[in-house]
Amino acid sequence: MEEEKASAAQSLIDVVNEIAAISDYRITVKKLCYNLARRLKLLVPMFEEIRESNEPISEDTLKTLMNLKEAMCSAKDYLKFCSQGSKIYLVMEREQVTSKLMEVSVKLEQSLSQIPYEELDISDEVREQVELVLSQFRRAKGRVDVSDDELYEDLQSLCNKSSDVDAYQPVLERVAKKLHLMEIPDLAQESVALHEMVASSGGDVGENIEEMAMVLKMIKDFVQTEDDNGEEQKVGVNSRSNGQTSTAASQKIPVIPDDFRCPISLEMMRDPVIVSSGQTYERTCIEKWIEGGHSTCPKTQQALTSTTLTPNYVLRSLIAQWCEANDIEPPKPPSSLRPRKVSSFSSPAEANKIEDLMWRLAYGNPEDQRSAAGEIRLLAKRNADNRVAIAEAGAIPLLVGLLSTPDSRIQEHSVTALLNLSICENNKGAIVSAGAIPGIVQVLKKGSMEARENAAATLFSLSVIDENKVTIGALGAIPPLVVLLNEGTQRGKKDAATALFNLCIYQGNKGKAIRAGVIPTLTRLLTEPGSGMVDEALAILAILSSHPEGKAIIGSSDAVPSLVEFIRTGSPRNRENAAAVLVHLCSGDPQHLVEAQKLGLMGPLIDLAGNGTDRGKRKAAQLLERISRLAEQQKETAVSQPEEEAEPTHPESTTEAADT
């Protein structure tokens, strides 16, 4: 049963990890899906404590855990569909989508309610967290709305009309923008999603599928018309400037070589990248393909052994040379990378500079990217307005992409630029949404020392948001932070410590830090006054001592003498943190309290109770109460023991023994 319990708990953790790996959701259901995924992630600490516990569980309890797994798998399938499914379907069939979400939520609530928590060896903090999740599922009942009414009505109006694009251009434009179907790769992915729905259901997905296909065709025609109009206007302007007719100009445009076209979009590539099969694609197109759940090369159908995309600088240079030779404007960056209007807070000169930097980041050679990332790093450090402007210009996804570059200097500039941008609260969410955490963790593991320090500082900045604490911990940031705390420079240790402190506020990260070996490092830093890390070490220990594993390891590390000394001579903050650690150590374990008393705890403790910080006074009062209780117990024991020993002794025998 012990193995079955551990296996069940691990399988639940695996399901949550699969849910956490779902990177994004369709815009119409994004908030609902993120809320559902966030609640499920909060259950991980319970599963970890069940897995690591030595206490056996009954067969009935094991069944309730497996029922929860079944409910979570249903939630995972629902979230996958909301990530990869048809955007049009999610709006037009909103009642079904709502009903399915309610069904999933009810199933999760019922499964969680059936678990006999009193039989599980889990901490009070984790139990409270599970109860919070359960209450959130209960409150969420009947409050589901997956799309706005205007979008739904627009789609219905398109279904009820003819397929004449010109007649419904305002509606089509509104729908295409709201559903993010303004680019050819997005339209291709939507088409694939509709086809996969048909295939998975045996060709029968309801009466509305034909209407959805018709609406998609109307949107495609509208987008194509818009693109054609844009090209005609561009050609017309160029030809008028040369004193020629647009017809003559168009006749001069040469045929684009096939090697310059993306095999997916058939358009000239603007940001060519190589996949593991050796084929080259437009970056945005192949990213959409991979994000859609495909694991094969679109052209060769070979399995992709890696999702790494390598910039094809040679082809990019050839395309630029061909454009110049044929007097054609080089291809603009894709919309996601194209420099957007820079914030009005920046000066015109800085606005132009930022746009140029975006171009160099996206399309420059390594030397251009290195200098551009370095300049963005400095601009973002300078003031708040620049941080807003740089983010609005689209720098964040470009910088995230450069975190994986083999060039250590580009890597260092990029992670530091993200650190400076993260000072702006609104940028924190954008950085995490851009998928920055895995790249930052990789820099933290293998970057230069300065890059590692700045990666740690970036994680600290991002972890200010509670949801990010869960994400950062789940993506493996804690072990390399512990390594940096142990072997980094003075600044690196400080950055690692502040990040670890923030992350360990979340209960689920405490066990990760403890298992990564942070406590021996922290206790060593306590005994090295010259390290300048005493404040940070005590603050983290105060958090970790509330965890059962943490309490046990601290208790076995001979930390009590140091804690008593800090209560006696430390700063106000160190005194309160040392007292907080001691409170946890002495809870249910009087030997530490006895040791502390022998070391002269009482005097400093009374002083702390009268002159410490508010928290310090509370902790001192708790310790004094425990000391008082222990003294009473010792007194009762001392009184009862002589009576028990005196009973078999008689006066005669005592005298006799004395005479002898």
UniProtKB/Swiss-Prot annotation:
Its main location: nucleus. Residues 255-329 form the U-box domain. Its EC number is 2.3.2.27. Phosphorylated by SD1-6 and SD1-7. SMART domains: ARM (SM00185), Ubox (SM00504). Keywords: Cytoplasm, Nucleus, Phosphoprotein, Repeat, Transferase, Ubl conjugation pathway. This is U-box domain-containing protein 13. It is found in: Nucleus; Cytoplasm. One of its GO terms (molecular function) is ubiquitin-protein transferase activity.
